[in-house]
Amino acid sequence: MTVTGIIAEFNPFHNGHKYLLEQASGLKIIAMSGNFVQRGEPAIVDKWTRAQMALEAGADLVLELPFLVSVQAADFFAKGAVDILERLGIDYLMFGTEEVLDYESISKVYGEKAEQMEAYLAGLPDSLSYPQKTQAMWQEFAGLNFSGSTPNHILGLAYAKAVAGRDIKLCSIQRQGAGYHSLSANQEFASATALRQNLDQPDFLKKFTPAHHLLETAPKVIWSDLFSYLRYQIVTCPDLTNFYQVNQELAVRIRVALKSSETIEELVEQVATKRYTKARVRRLLTYILVGARQEELPSGVHILGFSEQGRQHLSQLKGKVELVSRIGKDPWDSLTQQADKVYQLGNPALREQNFGRVPIMKGK
């Protein structure tokens, strides 16, 4: 049977995600961000609720990306997720994108010229942000010209890099309906951004989310719920450079900006520069919030849920892949579990996120 992998956040799960799943063939494996997502913010609802949404819409297996894969720039996010999906035996990696391109050919370009391309990237001036450097690299070697306002396309290129040299085929699907950041909605599709801004509108959620009942009833977490904890971390930590990827320049900028910032948006706005994008700053603040330091990624794969087909696939992997279905005395990934504890501070109605939790079985 064909095995299709999808890398996702489902923040929250909407009709566009359902459409993507419907286009996938064979067994459908989702590598999903945990309780913090790639752009450096808490997921609007917890990982278990989002896994349930995916299973109800046709996913066969949902696994959790570790924190230090979930909260990363596109290239590192893609590589970490593909590393995990490859171990689970995927044949295809499917993703939505704003651009209709031959990503397979782009992947081959990187496979043939990876060393030159990375050397070119490293030689670009530090005054450029990482996304700007990446855009310059693709323009130079593949003739691609794109803006930073198409995040799914940027991720598509990151996936092309990540699968280069692997026995995984890329399958891109044209993004349906509203753009990634769009606040508008058409007859069938609304962006995750629009949904996050309309959480108090049941009719809107019912129209654009297949599992609206789960989204409406699940405890929500947003940055403002955690901002006071971030302030505490910054004020009480003697050296912010101890946290993952925080350099001295950023540590100073963050401390100065905090004095006149009352919200996370104000803090990000004041810290960000041309070189340090807002997305990067949000990720750094998330690292500080959860106390992230450089750590090895876990060897095991944490399973959040499965269908009967997914269960059968897992049984074939036993002995070949370290599968984690219950987190007990021995941690799966201590940093992810630490991040989950911080996430729970955002809403007292949240259930325990790790201990005693077992994978969701679809239909039971």
Curated annotation (Swiss-Prot):
Disulfide bonds: none annotated. Transmembrane segments: none annotated. It catalyses: cytidine(34) in elongator tRNA(Met) + acetate + ATP = N(4)-acetylcytidine(34) in elongator tRNA(Met) + AMP + diphosphate. It is found in: Cytoplasm. Its main location: cytoplasm. GO terms for molecular function: ATP binding; ligase activity, forming carbon-nitrogen bonds; tRNA binding. ATP binds at residues 7-20, 96, 152, 175. Its EC number is 6.3.4.-. InterPro entries: Rossmann-like_a/b/a_fold, tRNA(Met)_cyd_acetate_ligase. Keywords: ATP-binding, Cytoplasm, Ligase, Nucleotide-binding, RNA-binding, tRNA processing, tRNA-binding. Signal peptide: none annotated. Catalyzes the formation of N(4)-acetylcytidine (ac(4)C) at the wobble position of elongator tRNA(Met), using acetate and ATP as substrates. First activates an acetate ion to form acetyladenylate (Ac-AMP) and then transfers the acetyl group to tRNA to form ac(4)C34. This is tRNA(Met) cytidine acetate ligase. The lineage of its organism: Bacteria, Bacillati, Bacillota, Bacilli, Lactobacillales.
